[in-house]
Structures are given as C-alpha cells and as structure tokens.
C-alpha cells in the first residue's frame, strides 16, 4: 500500500 498526502 502506498499513501501520498498532498
């Protein structure tokens, strides 16, 4: 799983 907050 990959999570990238912007």
From Swiss-Prot:
General function of this protein: Myotropic peptide. Stimulates the contractions of the oviduct.
GO biological process terms held by the UniProt record: neuropeptide signaling pathway
Source taxon at top rank: Eukaryota
Glutamic acid 1-amide modified-residue sites: 6
Keyword entries, A-Z: Amidation, Neuropeptide
Name listed for the protein in its UniProt record: Oviductal motility-stimulating peptide
């Amino acid at each position: 799983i990959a999570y990238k907050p912007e």
